[in-house]
């Protein structure tokens, strides 16, 4: 039987797997990506793409391609709640930073605006990045078995186009093979939470809803019908305003049920105008889960993406978390495989990302449940008669004590959903604690709601804050100063000794450390003073930034032996022990 050898095998070619393949190739790692499917996603699926994820795609050089295909942030921001598109609109709110009270928060946080792009459009863009960097991706290549030993992992692969089987032997394997992960089940990863807590069906449609939506443009519409056996339908927009991918929740729905006539009835009811024609392109049943792997590493095998965390689509966190898993893991694998770091560095992947996965799973489930108070206040529930719905709506709009109470409850329900639509802190505010963050300091207390608001900091374990600086009159983000194939030391006006230390330590340890000097009339000119205000170290201090743009360490000043100090930190971070004092 044919045996192929590689350093890393990536199982799965969704958002997590393709991103891992692209980043590994960019880092010079010999890797192979496989998927049993014949191509990228064939339906919309995930769609909200937050700023951290766009930053990853920016780093991969494909942000421009993303913008060409995506629905931009400036037409994403109106969320409507109505009995149908043509019917009564009961509530409206702003989302994804579109509100006047949140717009500046989002603009200050990142050089990259978020966007709405369905998965079947996003995956080819990441695939383009992967191939541009030389990644090998094999379609129609199905994992059928795997086992690991002390020195590596052997995977049995079936070529689905020829039915031939062959083995791939790798040093490490990434299981990014989705919610039914064979890697997770075969290796024995344990999960916490609850599987299959609800059923839903997505229906990808061609339907022109321009006259109902162009004047109140948004990425998602919520439709609560006046008479139906479904609770609510949620309508993500795939292409403004003629392509949609609604999903329908119904209690007790049989798994796999795809009765097209029933679905056509739900769709007509949600549109509310019998003259609007539509065409069903694809029907996809799925389950709502609330689970996360207890650890993301067992031996030489790692989980990433939906293989590690599975949850409600609320908050739009799924593909974002998946891509960011890979952004955390790939540089660590590259560091270990190049000999720059000890294998123990790979333990920090689970230490850092598993708590993020747990937070995301819990937040998504909480947001899923937090739709119900609005529905209850609106008086629209699954299974009610049209007469009951009319009575409830008449009371809601009426001049009565009960009507006023319900209107207040309706507003409160919309406000509660801010934790789904404007959860900027959940999207951007990850804080890491692991051995890859040496000499950890206490994180600052949150000054605002930690889920709704992102609070930038340079405390180690925080993501590097974005501000604009200038180089030769060109505006540059601080995030663009970071190199994914190495570490970056950010210094100031008094940082020459740190720059020399970085060169010496990089040469001694054979680990790339680039430098960038920021400040007034420095290499990167801080004319506005925004960097000086946020850096939290002096002109003679420094920040050591990891390839994934998280701050590994900082020093507020200049010690007597900056080279020795930096050497000790790097050796500790890389799991190579400590140098003599």
Region spans (language model):
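Beta1/beta-strand and adjacent pyrophosphate-binding region of the FAD-binding site
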Residues: 2-16
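Core beta-strand elements of the Rossmann-like FAD/NAD(P) dinucleotide-binding domain
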Residues: 4-6, 162-172
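Conserved mid-domain beta->alpha element of the FAD-binding
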Residues: 12-21, 126, 175, 280, ...
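Glycine-rich FAD pyrophosphate-binding loop
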Residues: 25-45
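Active-site-adjacent segment of FAD-dependent monooxygenases/related oxidoreductases
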Residues: 45-131
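Conserved FAD-binding catalytic core of PHBH/FMO-like flavoproteins
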Residues: 128, 172, 176-288
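A conserved short coil-to-beta-strand element within the FAD-binding core of flavoproteins
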Residues: 139-154
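C-terminal helical "tail/cap" subdomain of flavin- and related membrane-associated enzymes
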Residues: 334-462, 474, 483, 487, ...
């Amino acid at each position: 039987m044919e045996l192929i050898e590689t350093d890393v095998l990536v199982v799965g070619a969704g958002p997590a797997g393709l991103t891992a393949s692209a980043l590994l190739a960019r880092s010079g790692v010999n890797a192979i990506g496989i998927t049993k499917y014949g191509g990228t996603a064939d339906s919309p699926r995930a769609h909200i793409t937050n700023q951290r994820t766009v930053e990853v795609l920016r780093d991969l050089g494909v942000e421009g391609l993303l913008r060409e295909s995506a629905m931009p942030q400036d037409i994403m921001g109106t969320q409507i709640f109505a009995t149908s598109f043509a019917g009564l609109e009961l509530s409206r709110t702003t989302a994804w930073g579109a509100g006047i009270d949140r717009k500046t928060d989002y603009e200050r946080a990142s050089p990259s605006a978020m966007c709405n792009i369905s998965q079947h459009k996003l995956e080819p863009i990441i695939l383009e990045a992967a191939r541009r960097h030389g990644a090998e991706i094999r379609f129609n290549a199905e994992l059928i078995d795997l086992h690991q030993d002390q020195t590596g992992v052997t995977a049995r692969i079936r070529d689905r186009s020829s039915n031939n089987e062959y083995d791939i032997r790798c040093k490490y394997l990434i299981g990014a093979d989705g919610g039914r992960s064979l890697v997770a089940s075969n290796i024995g990863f344990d999960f916490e939470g609850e599987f299959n807590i609800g059923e839903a069906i997505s229906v990808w449609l061609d339907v022109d809803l321009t006259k109902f939506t162009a004047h109140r443009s948004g990425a998602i519409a919520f439709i609560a019908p006046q008479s139906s056996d479904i609770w609510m339908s949620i309508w993500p927009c795939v292409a403004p305003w003629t392509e949609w991918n609604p999903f329908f929740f119904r209690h007790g729905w049989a798994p796999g049920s795809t009765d097209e006539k029933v679905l056509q009835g739900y769709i007509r009811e949600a549109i509310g105008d019998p003259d609007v024609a539509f065409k069903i392109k694809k029907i996809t049943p799925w389950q709502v889960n609330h689970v996360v792997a207890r650890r993301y590493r067992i031996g030489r095998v790692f989980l990433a993406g939906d293989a590690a965390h599975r949850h409600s689509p609320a908050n739009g966190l799924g593909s974002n978390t998946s891509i960011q898993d890979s952004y955390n893991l790939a540089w660590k694998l590259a560091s270990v495989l190049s000999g720059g770091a000890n294998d123990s560095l790979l333990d920090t992947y689970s230490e850092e990302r598993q708590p993020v996965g747990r937070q995301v799973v819990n937040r998504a489930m909480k947001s899923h449940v937090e739709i119900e108070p609005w529905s209850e206040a609106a008086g629209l529930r699954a299974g009610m008669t049209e007469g009951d719905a009319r009575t409830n709506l008449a009371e809601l709009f009426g001049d009565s004590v009960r009507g006023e109470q319900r209107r207040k409850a309706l507003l409160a329900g919309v406000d509660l959903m801010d934790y789904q639509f404007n959860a900027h802190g959940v999207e951007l505010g990850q804080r890491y604690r692991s051995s890859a963050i040496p000499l950890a300091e206490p994180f600052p207390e949150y000054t605002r709601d930690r889920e709704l608001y992102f609070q930038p900091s340079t405390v180690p374990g925080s993501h590097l804050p974005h501000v604009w600086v200038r180089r030769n009159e060109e505006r540059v983000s601080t995030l663009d100063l970071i190199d994914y194939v190495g570490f970056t030391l950010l210094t100031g006006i008094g940082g020459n000794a740190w720059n020399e230390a970085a060169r010496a330590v990089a040469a001694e340890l054979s680990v790339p450390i680039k430098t960038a000097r920021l400040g007034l009339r420095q290499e990167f000119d801080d004319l506005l003073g925004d960097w000086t205000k946020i850096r939290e170290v002096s002109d003679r201090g420094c920040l050591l930034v990891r390839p994934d743009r998280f701050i590994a360490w900082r020093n507020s000043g200049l010690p007597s032996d900056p080279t020795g100090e930096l050497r000790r930190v790097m050796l500790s971070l890389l799991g190579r022990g400590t140098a003599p004092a």
